[in-house]
Amino acid sequence: MPSQEENELYMVKEAQRLRKSDPCAAMAWIITAKTLYPNAFNLQYEAYLLERDAQNYEEAAKCFSAIATNFQNQHTELWQEINSLTNALRNENETTPEHEFYVKMYKHLTPEVQHNIFMHTINHSADNLERIYIYILMFNKFPKSAITQAPRLLEMLAEGMKTEPDLYQRILVEEVLPMIQNKPPELSPNLACRLYTSSLEFYLRQIMDESDTADAWKNIFKVLMICGQMMGWEPFLPFSKHVNQNVYWEKLVDILSGSPAGSSQVLFYATTLFIYSLHGYIRNCKLRIEDADVTHVLVEGFMEWSPEGDGSEVPSMEPPKFSLTTAISPELSKAFLHAAQCWQLLNTDQFQRDFSQLMLALPLAPWISRFLFDLAIYFGHRDEANKLMADMTTQSSLVQSLQILSLNLMQGSMTLQGFQCILKILSELPTTQGQLLENMSLKGHRHMVFLPLTRSALVQYCVGAIISRLSRKVFEPNVPDRLLGDILVLQQLNLLNDVLLTQQIFNLIKQRKSFNLRTLSTYIINIDLLEELSHIWNSQQEDNFELTSSPNSSGTPTATTVAGGSQSRRIGTRGADKGARDEFRAITRQQIARCNENVITLLANFINQEHLMLAQHIFGISQPVETIVIK
């Protein structure tokens, strides 16, 4: 007598034989078999296949429900169908007949069966990523299930980030967090902080790729709020690019005042605000000028020197000011100062260890190295700045030369290295012309300047550095005549910047009754200077005033050098030179005709061509070639 299993198998085979040719007969066999053997999986599954092949969604759903309820843990065929069903639900936009069947059949399943299918799939899947996708699918279909199941999903995401951080971070921020943001689950502080750090890392990569940074910061602040809710933190402020950063800082200070030492809440709020301010600083350091991206570099500003010795050079304990030299200076200074505030808070004993670990986990190394160098300059920590500069490998030689020059100015005197940096800067001037800057010098207070890397600004800074070193020599006894002329040449960039210095130079010229002819005929093109020199010349009717000339600083004869080559020449208001007045007028007319020349180019050439003489002025270095001697 055949066994029950043999009878079941016989009936299934008969139904399978007739399934294509006579579905009704096949169904009759299955109905009879189900009546005789209601607990037989093969019969129940064959009944489902008949309904599936006939595209009977509702009847297929009934059969599938019975199988899924009664035979959860037993048969491979069932799990294959469940996988096909969940794959179709995850890709509902696909229009294949197979996908369409599963999607429509799913709608006829009871909610309880639907939910159980998801949970059984999650519990029996060995693939972590597959389980995560089923969780996401279940939360989309059953939003309330996230209340109890989200912690488990978030733990799985955190685990997956150890091996594939990019993939699991994207799933977290783009798929999971939006589903739980309205009612975040409670999590352990460690897990919530790990998830926030991973989200922050994901969005920072977007920001560094220069995608839509406003959206990225909006999402970062949103994730911060979600993770804060998970840990029961006092809410921070939502992101708005129109909110002044002072508002965020004041909110942070308010939270800090009511929090215990080393609070994770303050740590993460302050870290977020620090990175936000740091990004604003780094982003604004690059500005579009004349169709070119121009970087701004933080450098030491010039302090006006007074011969009266009013104590203005006594170092102040106050932090330096920021000069408003460009339109972007206010934004840059605010972002920098807010980043500095947060940095100082986060490097106190209560936060330093955890903050350092956070910084190691985030892709911020280029920003941090730039910021720390600028911070060292800001606080006047020259030794630290030098050490940090040695660790910065990505900057250009132009920027490095500018920063070394700035460090020279910070210490109050220019070294030979600083002067060599000026020559290197002038040899690497960019093509972007730019404009001259205002407020490069302040009286009585150390200040910082955000210098754009344009031709005009760089030459202006180099000229200012030389003048700041030489200007006080004008008030010393026995100042060389040549020095007076060279400073006048440099002052053409901004003649009104130091009226007292200009007056002192002209007073000395009047007293000594001489000026260098080559300096006048080669480098002086400013109308005001030419008029003043003409006035001095024309006013010397009785006393002789001489213009003297000799070989230039490189030893090469100029147009005004006599045929003898190295012989000095002089013309005066009276004496042997009969055509002196006509020659002087010709020289001044020639220079006036040049008044529209590019003074930036003129002064860059002057410094390059006369660098040996300038070095002698600054350092007292003996010239290896003949110098111009003024009577």
Curated annotation (Swiss-Prot):
User: Sorted alphabetically, which InterPro entries does this protein's record hold?
Assistant: ARM-type_fold, Int_cplx_su10
- Under what name is this protein listed? Integrator complex subunit 10
User: What is any one GO biological process for this UniProt entry?
Assistant: RNA polymerase II transcription initiation surveillance
**Where is the protein found, in the record's own terms?**
Nucleus
Q: Which organism is it from?
A: Drosophila melanogaster (Fruit fly)
So what does this one do?
A: Component of the integrator complex, a multiprotein complex that terminates RNA polymerase II (Pol II) transcription in the promoter-proximal region of genes. The integrator complex provides a quality checkpoint during transcription elongation by driving premature transcription termination of transcripts that are unfavorably configured for transcriptional elongation: the complex terminates transcription by (1) catalyzing dephosphorylation of the C-terminal domain (CTD) of Pol II subunit Polr2A/Rbp1 and Spt5, and (2) degrading the exiting nascent RNA transcript via endonuclease activity.
Q: Which portions of the sequence form the region Disordered?
A: 545-577
Q: List the disulfide bonds.
A: none
Write the record's keywords in alphabetical order, separated by commas.
Nucleus
